[in-house]
């Protein structure tokens, strides 16, 4: 029996006994969620690709749900891989395009493969959704999609005001943003197990854009595990948007096999709290215009 199956049985048992816990049964072991932060460039605009700041904030938000135990890993990969033991889900908020530390060594790939086979949830955020072509097989198997030479990326404005009936969408309110997106991904054959959640392109931000515009999705994997991916979150300021914030927290908890409350998972945060997690940076020197 994999981790997802055990967690599902815990929830069913709690429901049958009338235990009032929306996420996990009171008294059960907490759901361990490992947050892997990509290394943050020291010289860069404050908030840009602040993977560590984002993971620290996500840990604080996840703690608002009873029975959840977030564990933070800094700088790409843990010094001791034992941190993954017993994890209900693993979150990667890192650079992509082959820069992922989890893909840099056969042993690390095997470690993630083992977690996936055991039914652990997997969440990929922002550039972490972009595996290099050499790892397209893993990308499809783990997340249900792959970034290809035909895929696209860029910054543009988009509005998001309607969401499908899925647990990850619970309590998600509309938002508008100029974000850095990756879209035009290649999905598994027949979109089997895929549920699109958010769409974005330079010309729109809704379902009419179809498969090419998908930027957030869930994947019910054939092994019984769950994956959630979202290609936004280029800048730390995006966390100020409650709708986006709840989508991500819901997605992580859902990937861990947890039931999402009807109003969505709690994710209260004001600007002061969000900014308190910013990683100190040295701004890059101003660009000098050529004469």
Question: Language-model segments: which ranges?
Answer:
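Helical hinge/lid and interdomain linker segments adjacent to catalytic or ligand-binding clefts
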Residues: 4, 32-36, 43-131
